[in-house]
Amino acid sequence: MFRWYAINTYSGHENKVKANLEHRIISMNQAPRFRRVVVPTEQVIETKDGQKVQIEKRVYPGYLLVNMDLNDEIWKRVVQNVLLGQ
């Protein structure tokens, strides 16, 4: 059954961990067990030097959201290895 899971990582490394996880999923032929890997962000307008600038800000710094069909094999071979190799 597919469910959403929050995976904790170092703040600022979310995109690197996401890329590593996606690469691992493909290389281990586990794509059918994963639907989405997301770093939740939102567009925010901030004022810098008197000008409004639109930036992308992480909603949950230090977390990835993953929609997957989790089992022990997936956790040990894919997710845990990616997290250890941050």
Kindly give the residue locations of the regions a language model identified.
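Acidic-enriched and Gly/Ser
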Residues: 1-86
